[in-house]
A protein has these predicted regions:
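Catalytic phosphate/metal-binding cores of nucleic-acid and nucleotide-processing enzymes, i.e., regions
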Residues: 1-106
Length: 106
């Protein structure tokens, strides 16, 4: 399977997982060959989806940060036969945790 098809499949799989968690998320779109967001529907969060067996997480986070445009960059990733994981910068995790702890919506 080529990397574009595998990427699309990963994005669709993660969007489905998000919907199962109660969030109205769908796969993003590409326009004129330009990359858009991998998935949309999580306000304030920029999601980079990686569905690979070997992942350079620092490269993936750098890509998400580069494309985030003011949103919190995360990487949603998983291997075959494994659960979805979310990786994000520690400072962003603490920002979300403080908001949750204070009872605020992020």
């Amino acid at each position: 399977m080529n990397s574009k098809r595998k990427g699309k499949r990963g994005e669709l799989d993660f969007a489905k997982f998000c919907r199962e968690q109660g969030y109205d998320v769908r796969r993003g779109q590409q326009y004129n060959g330009l990359e858009g967001e991998d998935v949309v529907g999580l306000p304030g969060i920029h999601v980079e989806v990686k569905r690979v067996e070997r992942l350079n997480i620092y490269d993936a986070i750098a890509q998400s940060k580069r494309d985030a445009r003011g949103k919190i960059p995360i990487v949603a990733h998983r291997r075959n036969n494994c659960e979805w994981l979310i990786t994000m910068r520690a400072e962003d995790w603490f920002k979300l945790y403080r908001e949750w702890e204070a009872g605020n919506n992020v």
